[in-house]
Amino acid sequence: MTLSGKPAALLVGTLKHAHKEWEALGKYAELKTYSDGTREDFLAKCKTEFQNVKAICRTYNSKFYMGIFDKEIIDNLPPSVKFICHLGAGYETVDVAACTARGIQVSHVPKAVDDATADVGIFLMLGALRGFNQGIFELHKNNWNANCKPSHDPEGKTLGILGLGGIGKTMAKRARAFDMKIVYHNRTPLPEEEAEGAEFVSFDDLLAKSDVLSLNLPLNAHTRHIIGKPEFQKMKRGIVIVNTARGAVMDEAALVEALDEGIVYSAGLDVFEEEPKIHPGLLENEKVILLPHLGTNSLETQYKMECAVLMNVKNGIVNDSLPNLVPEQRGDIE
């Protein structure tokens, strides 16, 4: 406990919108912030002014000045830390295994991102199918409709979704408006009433049947490079790839090769394997639509995410438990 008799909550990084909600947490906890600095400085403060911190709210932007929450960081957190609340749906920048070993619960923000990320997925799918990026390239070169070949409509195509979670379900719901057939693959099939009209198929059938493949699964040890050269060889020639998940679920070099060979017709990508670095073969390909990780970059969604993560912090402080535990700590992933 602090001198005030309250446990402390530490914000690592910055909030853009939910400042009043953060201040309101002061009713339950002494509020501390770490909005810039270095990894070494943070580790030093863990031995001094962060000693009474019970819950940490970690934003994605903190990785740019102090790195990820890896085993080194986790092992040096004060013994008082019981909860880490990550601001984001993807949480690969937190070493969950190290947290579990120390008895630290980890939460993420899964539902608040669903609509915005699915919207970006639909945008990328339509743009890649219709070849819009080539038209954009030509206009920037002051060429009107030059070299723009006929493209493809979404109607009647099969959309394959790898990872029918919240974002995948929302993607399926939106895609139905385009009269697409929807198939999906999860490690475990969903009850029919939860699948948004999508048909469960095996992983190999997903690759073989899809005209468009949307990647909507988290990045972990099981999913890293789940799409690579062997998987591209099993796909329909002329498939469209959409990735709004994490770049490293797909082998970027293998994607470039598949594009060059004509296996992949086009791709729409919001995430990359080594952000902010992008494979030159993607940058040079006019048929590929690239966005700089804008999936949740809307005012409304950012506010929802920040409110959700602060609610997780409040639950940790007040109720001594976290909602929205990451799947590994719920036992969903071994």
Curated annotation (Swiss-Prot):
One of its GO terms (biological process) is generation of precursor metabolites and energy. Its EC number is 1.-.-.-. Pfam families: 2-Hacid_dh (PF00389), 2-Hacid_dh_C (PF02826). NAD(+) binds at G166, I167, T244, A245, R246, D270, H293, L294, G295, T296. Keywords: NAD, Oxidoreductase. The active site is at R246, E275, H293 (proton donor). One of its GO terms (cellular component) is nucleus. GO terms for molecular function: glyoxylate reductase (NADPH) activity; hydroxypyruvate reductase [NAD(P)H] activity; NAD binding. InterPro entries: D-isomer_2-hydroxyacid_DH, D-isomer_2_OHA_DH_cat_dom, D-isomer_DH_CS, D-isomer_DH_CS1, D-isomer_DH_NAD-bd, NAD(P)-bd_dom_sf. PANTHER family: 2-HYDROXYACID DEHYDROGENASE-RELATED, GLYOXYLATE REDUCTASE 1. Belongs to the D-isomer specific 2-hydroxyacid dehydrogenase family. This is Putative 2-hydroxyacid dehydrogenase UNK4.10. It comes from Schizosaccharomyces pombe (strain 972 / ATCC 24843).
